[in-house]
Amino acid sequence: MFTVFLLVVLATTVVSFTSDRASDGRKDAASGLIALTMKGCCSYPPCFATNPDCGRRR
C-alpha cells in the first residue's frame, strides 16, 4: 500500500513539474499585458501601433 502511495506522489510531482514548464511562456505574455494595462497604455489609441497585444484583449 505504501508503495502505491509513493508511486502516486511521484507521478503527481512529474505531471505538475512538466505542466509548469509548459505554461512559462504563457505567463510571460500575460505579465506583459498586465504591465501595459497598469501603465494605462491600452486607453491611449496611438499605443496600439507599438503594442498590438494590448488592443487584442478587447
UniProtKB/Swiss-Prot annotation:
Tissues/organs with expression: Expressed by the venom duct.
Domain of life of the source: Eukaryota
Residue ranges the record assigns to the propeptide: 17-39
Keywords: Acetylcholine receptor inhibiting toxin, Amidation, Disulfide bond, Ion channel impairing toxin, Neurotoxin, Postsynaptic neurotoxin, Secreted, Signal, Toxin
Principal subcellular localisation of the protein: secreted
UniProt xrefs under Pfam families: Toxin_8
Molecular-function GO term, any one: toxin activity
Statement: the UniProt record of this protein carries the keyword Signal: yes
Modification Cysteine amide occurs at: 54
Signal peptide start-end: 1-16
PROSITE patterns, per database record: ALPHA_CONOTOXIN
Compartments, record wording: Secreted
Keyword Lyase found: no
GO cellular component: extracellular region; host cell postsynaptic membrane
Disulfide cross-links: 41-47, 42-54
Coiled-coil regions, chain positions: none
Family: Belongs to the conotoxin A superfamily.
Function: Alpha-conotoxins act on postsynaptic membranes, they bind to the nicotinic acetylcholine receptors (nAChR) and thus inhibit them. This toxin blocks mammalian nAChR alpha-3-beta-4/CHRNA3-CHRNB4 subunits. Also exhibits inhibition of D.melanogaster alpha-7/CHRNA7 nAChRs.
UniProt free text on domains: The cysteine framework is I (CC-C-C). Alpha4/6 pattern.
Entry protein name: Alpha-conotoxin AuIB
